[in-house]
Amino acid sequence: MVAIVVPVYTDLLSEKDIISLKRLNRVMSHYPIVFVKPESLSPNLFRELCPTSVFENFPDNMFAGKKAYNNLMMSEQFYERFLGYKYILIYQTDCYIFRDELMSWCEKGYDYVGAPWIKRDVYDRPFIRTYMKISRYLTRLFNKPDRQELFNRVGNGGLSLRNVRRHYDFIREYPLVVKRFTEAKQYHLYNEDVFWSIEVNKHNINPFIYPDHITALSFSFD
């Protein structure tokens, strides 16, 4: 039903990366653990840290920086590899998992779950609120992305549960929407998690289902 997918681009791991992967192996090794990596990267260290893991290789250029990674996570070929599962849990190596509640989250029927981007209280101060209204007007006028759309939305892709078929089908059905993001200049509002959290339901006649931001805090926090 679900696999844990760990994207990696190097085996020069920090101490925190190693702690993260050891914890993953300790708590979650009864699930399939799949490392997504460049073709040229040796699997040896990852196999040592997570002995039951398997590997999916992609061309090296798909890991050549943040932009390339974002494009990989919006690509048909990525989700196609995991169509044998209903869900994948993306687990980047800066995550730390406290306990296993994965199956209970899979059973809730959401299409995407990640740590919510909580709106900070400072944005409700009168001066800041006025500034944000002007900013929103200008972004709409010039058809630019608006960071205010992220407030209390779900959420961060670093630890995220994704319905594989829903993601795969959207990419196939709306290639021009995907292309607008993949061809945009590197900017955080064009990141893949913004795409899956916000952009898809601007176009999708069959909307993605997300938890509200309070519920999502029980899944993960950033």
List each model region and its residues.
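Conserved donor-nucleotide/metal-binding helix-loop-beta segment in metal-dependent transferases, i.e.
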Residues: 96-134
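Short, acidic, metal-binding catalytic loop of nucleotide-sugar glycosyltransferases
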Residues: 20-31
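Short beta-strand-to-loop acidic/aromatic patch adjacent to the donor-nucleotide binding site
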Residues: 85-97
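Short, charged/polar "capping" segments at the starts of alpha-helices
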Residues: 12-16, 39-46, 102
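N-proximal low-complexity "stem/linker" segments adjacent to membrane-targeting elements
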Residues: 1-22
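Catalytic core and acceptor-binding pocket of nucleotide-sugar-dependent glycosyltransferases
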Residues: 141-222
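Membrane-proximal basic amphipathic "stem/tether" segments
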Residues: 1, 123-149
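Active-site-proximal specificity loops/subdomain of glycosyltransferases
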Residues: 36-86
